[in-house]
């Protein structure tokens, strides 16, 4: 269920703040969102896969914490990122 290197690089290029940015909250949230989307699709096909369900809950929690951090440090970037990723908040 992990993302391949090419997908991560595409997401990083799309959401990075500067040329060498690979770990900002924006990039991490975007990668987690893509991973969550893939896990949701997997769980639609395999509803009894409890390990994947737990992994999904863990990833959602990580993303929520990063979103809270971004909202507390830079509200404008937070709102922009929410709009770009089509997340509810």
UniProtKB/Swiss-Prot annotation:
UniProt xrefs under Gene3D superfamilies: 6.10.250.3130, S15/NS1, RNA-binding (1.10.287.10)
PROSITE patterns on file: RIBOSOMAL_S15
One Gene Ontology cellular component: cytosolic small ribosomal subunit
Keywords for the protein's UniProt record, in alphabetical order: Ribonucleoprotein, Ribosomal protein, RNA-binding, rRNA-binding
Pfam families: Ribosomal_S15
One of the protein's GO biological processes: translation
Alphabetized GO MF terms: rRNA binding; structural constituent of ribosome
InterPro entries: Ribosomal_uS15, Ribosomal_uS15_bac-type, uS15_NS1_RNA-bd_sf
Function statement: One of the primary rRNA binding proteins, it binds directly to 16S rRNA where it helps nucleate assembly of the platform of the 30S subunit by binding and bridging several RNA helices of the 16S rRNA. Forms an intersubunit bridge (bridge B4) with the 23S rRNA of the 50S subunit in the ribosome.
Similarity-based family: Belongs to the universal ribosomal protein uS15 family.
Record's subunit section: Part of the 30S ribosomal subunit. Forms a bridge to the 50S subunit in the 70S ribosome, contacting the 23S rRNA.
Cross-referenced HAMAP family: Ribosomal_uS15_B
Protein name: Small ribosomal subunit protein uS15
Source species of the chain: Chlamydia trachomatis serovar D (strain ATCC VR-885 / DSM 19411 / UW-3/Cx)
Gene: rpsO
């Amino acid at each position: 269920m992990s993302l391949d290197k090419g997908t991560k690089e595409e997401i990083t290029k799309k959401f990075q703040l500067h040329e060498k940015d690979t770990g900002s909250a924006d990039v991490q949230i975007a990668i987690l969102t893509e991973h969550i989307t893939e896990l949701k699709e997997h769980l639609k096909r395999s509803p009894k896969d409890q390990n994947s369900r737990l992994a999904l809950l863990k990833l959602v929690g990580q993303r929520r914490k990063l979103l809270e951090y971004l909202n507390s440090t830079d509200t404008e970037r937070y709102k922009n990122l929410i709009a770009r990723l089509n997340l509810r908040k």
